[in-house]
Design a protein with these regions (language model features):
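Acidic/polar loop patches that form or flank catalytic/metal-binding clefts of enzymes
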Residues: 1-4, 13, 36-37, 63-69
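Flexible glycine/proline-rich, aromatic-decorated loop/lid segments
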Residues: 3-34
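Acidic, glycine-rich active-site loops and adjacent beta-strand->loop/helix elements
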Residues: 5-12, 44-46, 72-74, 217-220
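Peripheral docking tails and interdomain loops at the edges
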Residues: 31-32, 37, 46, 224, ...
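Active-site/ligand-binding-proximal alpha/beta "capping" segment
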Residues: 34-59
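Flexible, low-complexity linker and terminal segments
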Residues: 51, 56-224, 228, 236
Length: 236
């Protein structure tokens, strides 16, 4: 499933015509317990369209809820575009078993069994005539049977963690603008793209500071971000 959050100023009714970006951490860790979610963060109206269909693609591949996150500046105001780019290939439905032969090829099939080690189990579709689907909202084992066993619970949480971690490098990568002399770094997201570009120009023209920027476009971060941040002393 996909849920799109267009953030305005809160709390409660808040300021209904003002933009804000404070919902990001709420979406990333939504729900109770130890959990994470995939969040796509467009910064332009073109990316809003692209990330819209891409969110459904990712949700199918990883069998998980995906949040789209934009702010009121993008969601309510008028923006110009040269035209949206449509997907040039079919969306990936992920690990869907469509035939009895495919089902028989999996030893000891279970709806939540991690066959490939990536945290994403195989699934059948309702009405396919294959193995019936058993979904539970409570704790369950690999076969979907209710369980409160600590070991099974820990294994389930670890599997979900592997699934989200595996999405890192398939999500929209951050956009980096790097200076050779890395004096100042700005990490940002969302519709402040034009504002940050203006700040970059003002700082460099008035102070001579060289500004490098990184616009994050998805959570979890691209794995490369962790490597780059660990190698540099940068103020954010």
């Amino acid at each position: 499933g996909v849920i799109w959050d267009i953030n305005r100023v809160g709390p409660s009714t808040g300021l209904p015509t003002r933009t804000q970006q404070g919902d990001l951490t709420m979406l990333y860790e939504a729900s109770h317990g130890d959990t994470q979610h995939i969040v796509l963060i467009p910064g332009t109206v073109d990316e809003c369209f692209e990330f819209g269909w891409r969110a459904f693609d990712v949700a199918e591949q990883f069998q998980t809820l995906v949040f789209g996150f934009s702010d009121l500046d993008l969601g309510m105001n008028r923006w110009a575009t040269a035209g949206f780019e449509y997907p040039d290939q079919k969306l990936d439905r992920g690990k869907v078993i469509r035939t009895q032969e495919q089902l028989d090829a999996i030893e000891n099939f279970g709806r939540y069994r991690d066959v490939d080690g990536d945290g994403i189990p195989y699934r059948t579709l309702p009405g396919s005539g294959l193995e019936p689907i058993l979904y539970r909202g409570t704790g369950h084992d690999e076969d979907g049977i209710y369980s409160e066993d600590p070991g099974i619970y820990a294994a389930t949480v670890a599997r979900l963690k592997r699934k989200i971690e595996g999405a890192r490098d398939l999500l929209p990568a951050p956009i980096l603008r790097e200076e050779n002399d890395k004096q100042v770094g700005i990490i940002y997201y969302g519709s402040v793209e034009n504002t940050i570009t203006e700040i970059d120009d003002i700082l460099e023209s008035t102070t001579g500071l060289k500004v490098s920027t990184c616009r994050v476009r998805a959570l979890p971060y691209l794995s490369l971000i962790h490597i780059r941040r660990s190698r540099r002393s940068i103020r954010s």
